[in-house]
Each structure stands twice: as structure tokens, then as C-alpha cells.
């Protein structure tokens, strides 16, 4: 599940902080490990955060990175399979289409790493502590899939 879902978990933690609990369901697939998982991240407030990761789709599906964030005054939509890839849909008014650099999350992540080890100045995206917390969250998600229960962090 780490390779499958760590990027989703990193993003959730980066945007919303450390959850108090997780509740996950998953499917063991052809890899012999979790090949599809859905997690609800539980916070003390009223946030509703769900992330899904999987690689058992039919080959014709392709690969998609996406998110939907529903806010009080707008909805933010991103999908690597759609054009435009990123839209801001305000409650009132016309949709806004911010510029998004060409590429995908993986290529940007690799370039960031290469720049970092090459000694180029790079912006810190997450701290080592946040990286460790992402692994803690993933381990809690795995336990939740096994026990079919919420797991506290």
C-alpha cells in the first residue's frame, strides 16, 4: 500500500494536516498486496476527506491523478485526464482556469529530488517529520483494512 497510496496520503496531510483517525477499505489484488484502497481521514472538525488509490483498473482506463475540494465559496477540480486540468468553480461567477505547468506529479517530484541532490536550491515541500507521519498514516490505513475498524493516530 505504501507505493500505491503514499502520494495521496502525503497530499491529504500537506493540505489538511494530521488526521485523528482513519477508516480504510482495501482489496488484495494480483500483486499479492493492496491493489486498491479507499480511506476516510477523520478530523476533530467537520472536514470530510476521502482518498482513493488503485492500479487494478482496466488497461484502457489509463492513469489519472485527480482531486475535488468543495469549499464554502468554490469547488476546486483537478484531473490529469481532462483539459483544462485545473478549474476553480466559484459559487457565484464564471469558472477560473489557472495556468498549470506541463508535466505530472511524478516528473515534478523526480526533478525536485534531482535538483536537491545536485545542490540546486529547492523549496522545502514537506518536512522529514511530515514524511514520517505519512508513513504512520499508511500503517494505520493498513491496520484499518485488516480490522475493518477506525484506527487512531
Language model features with spans:
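A generic "alpha-helical surface" signal
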Residues: 2-3, 10, 104, 129-132
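Contiguous beta-strand/loop segments that form the cofactor/metal-binding neighborhood of enzyme cores
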Residues: 3-83, 110-121
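Alpha-helical packing segments of well-folded alpha/beta enzyme cores
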Residues: 8, 109, 134-138
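Conserved beta-strand positions that form and line the central face of beta-propeller blades
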Residues: 21, 97, 152
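Short acidic, glycine-rich loop/turn motifs
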Residues: 41-45, 88-93
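C-terminal helix-rich "cap/oligomerization" subdomain common to oxidoreductases
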Residues: 42-44, 114-153
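Short amphipathic beta-strand/extended segments with alternating polar/hydrophobic composition
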Residues: 50-53, 76-80, 89, 94-103
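Active-site loop of classical SDR/Rossmann-like NAD(P)-dependent oxidoreductases
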Residues: 99-111, 126
Amino acid at each position: 500500500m505504501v507505493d500505491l497510496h503514499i502520494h495521496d496520503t502525503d497530499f491529504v496531510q500537506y493540505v489538511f494536516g494530521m488526521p485523528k483517525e482513519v477508516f480504510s477499505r482495501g482489496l488484495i489484488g494480483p500483486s499479492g498486496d493492496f491493489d486498491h484502497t479507499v480511506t476516510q481521514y477523520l478530523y476533530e472538525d467537520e472536514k470530510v476527506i476521502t482518498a482513493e488509490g488503485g492500479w487494478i483498473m482496466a488497461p484502457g482506463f489509463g492513469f489519472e491523478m485527480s482531486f475535488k475540494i468543495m469549499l464554502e465559496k468554490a469547488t476546486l477540480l483537478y484531473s490529469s485526464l481532462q483539459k483544462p486540468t485545473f478549474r476553480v468553480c466559484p459559487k457565484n461567477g464564471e469558472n477560473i482556469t489557472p495556468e498549470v505547468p506541463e508535466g505530472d506529479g511524478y516528473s515534478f517530484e523526480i526533478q525536485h529530488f534531482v535538483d536537491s541532490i545536485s545542490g540546486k536550491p529547492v523549496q522545502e515541500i514537506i518536512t522529514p517529520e511530515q514524511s514520517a507521519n505519512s508513513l504512520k498514516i499508511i500503517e494505520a490505513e493498513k491496520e484499518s483494512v485488516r480490522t475493518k475498524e477506525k484506527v487512531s493516530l
